[in-house]
Structures are given as structure tokens and as C-alpha cells.
């Protein structure tokens, strides 16, 4: 029984497959857990000892469909249902014609 170089050629089964949550090939088939995001755990796996890994998958690295809108609304103070004041240039142009 060898446990080194000669036994590596006998490996032929897949231990990891694609994860449903993060998409990486880190989902362990026998353990049924993802090594990257921790699926099926409810909380996403993240550690401070790898600041670079956090940077790769934090807010702002994707589309941010919702957060883009929130940032814009925040700048305007989350106002809703108001009508903008008419601009002077627009008022002058409409009155002259």
C-alpha cells in the first residue's frame, strides 16, 4: 500500500461539483457542503483571515440591481410622491413661444 505518487494515478471519482449558490466547483458531494460559501448553511461563509477573498465577493462586485436604486434615493433623502419645481429656463421658453 503506497500513499504517495503512485496512488495518485488511481484517483478517478469527483469529490467536488458545482455549487448551486455560489457557482464554484467547491460543493463536496459526500459532505454535502460547499467549501467556498458554506451552502446549505443559511449564513454565507466568510472569514477575516482572507481579506482578499472577501473583496472578491462583497457588495459592489456584481450588478447591485437594488442597491444602485437605494444609493440614489438616499442622496435625495428617500423622498416620495413630490413634484419637482419648474425650472426658470423651462418656464421662460414656454412663455416666449
From Swiss-Prot:
Gene3D superfamilies: 2.20.25.30. InterPro entries: Ribosomal_eL37, Ribosomal_eL37/eL43, Ribosomal_eL37_CS, Ribosomal_zn-bd. Residues 45-65 are annotated as: Disordered. GO terms for cellular component: cytosolic large ribosomal subunit. Its main location: cytoplasm. It is found in: Cytoplasm. A zinc finger (C4-type) spans 19-37. One of its GO terms (molecular function) is structural constituent of ribosome. The keyword Mitochondrion does not apply. GO terms for biological process: translation. PROSITE patterns: RIBOSOMAL_L37E. Component of the large ribosomal subunit. The ribosome is a large ribonucleoprotein complex responsible for the synthesis of proteins in the cell. Component of the large ribosomal subunit. This is Large ribosomal subunit protein eL37. The lineage of its organism: Eukaryota, Metazoa, Chordata, Craniata, Vertebrata. The gene is rpl37.
Amino acid at each position: 500500500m503506497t500513499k504517495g505518487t503512485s496512488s495518485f494515478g488511481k484517483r478517478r471519482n469527483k469529490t467536488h461539483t458545482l455549487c448551486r449558490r455560489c457557482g464554484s466547483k467547491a460543493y463536496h458531494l459526500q459532505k454535502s457542503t460547499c467549501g467556498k460559501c458554506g451552502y446549505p448553511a443559511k449564513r454565507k461563509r466568510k472569514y477575516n483571515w482572507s481579506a482578499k477573498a472577501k473583496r472578491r465577493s462583497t457588495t459592489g462586485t456584481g450588478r447591485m440591481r437594488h442597491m444602485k436604486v437605494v444609493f440614489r434615493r438616499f442622496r435625495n433623502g428617500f423622498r416620495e410622491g413630490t413634484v419637482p419645481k419648474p425650472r426658470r429656463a423651462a418656464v421662460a421658453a414656454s412663455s416666449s413661444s
